[in-house]
Amino acid sequence: MRFQPPEDIFPSVKDWLELGAESKRKGIYKSIYPHFYLKKRVKNPPVRYPIKLAEGYAAIIPGGRVWGDNGAIVTPENKLIWDVSLEWVKNKWDHSIFKMETLPPVTHHYDAIADLTHVGSRNYYHWMFEVLPRLHLIRESGFTVNRYILKYAPKHSPFQSETMTHLGISRDDIQKTHRQFHIQAENLIVPSQPTFVTKWAYDFLRNSFLTENKLNPSINKRIYISRRETRRILNENDLIEFLTGYGFIKVELEWMSVAEQVQLFSGAEAIVAPHGAGLTNLTFCPPKTKILEIFPSTYITGLYWLISALGNLDYYYFIGASEQVPNAQQWHGYDNLTIDMKKFSSFFKNIGIK
């Protein structure tokens, strides 16, 4: 059976339950974690206060459908649910599902299937904070699950298989999405899809990967994280020479397992790094760890400042001169940068690392 693209959009699962058709009566919505307001902990943060962190919930959509590689959620009335179908588009109507003339034939599943898809699943930050915590919400809900739907590419992103195995999910439990993917479940279980750092996700990651592992802290206490691809520091050799004088060592996280990264960060006392997904591991740092994040002038975000605030870390940031990468499609998140070492040296000496 083929479907036309959705006829309309519900902003959220809760809106579908309140405004949808008769099928809503069979839907179930469980709020697991309420909204959380973050208290101010650092001076001059890179984002504005107050910070309202999203609610965590899990819901059952009887007869719900999942379409495409990114896992768009469609109701039995053929309407897209936006808050669990996010794509990086400016307008909701630019979602890829609306560019289809017809959708692929649907496969019916007469059991309970849980959706864990996310457009950014191949990125370490998005996987750790916006995919894995959804599994936690499902478990907290008490809903029975037969299989999980994932945007899953462990050969490209080995952290996916390592973390899923650690959390007790085997390859046989996973159904991978693809461009022609289109299923309808007897009971589609849909947890909320975080779009930013949340306290409950932070706590879940620490409880799952730090406490349970009982890791021995790394002997490397002062760490500089180097990037091999985008957002590189073009005069990095000058920076490394400076930091070496303060006992820092250079690491490349791309070559490390998740367990090794957790161990490294759990024993750190100071970390310097250009902005990048590896700083997701600040989640595992002990309180008061000094963090110095380096941004290009064209791309500044409060993502890792927020993780630092949740962990009571001593966070600072420094802004370098940006240089746009060719063919970056005008998105400045890929920009490389150059550091004015005279300014950096003065700034560094004022943050208390001796």
Briefly describe each language-model feature range:
Residues 1-354:
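The feature primarily captures lumenal catalytic ectodomains
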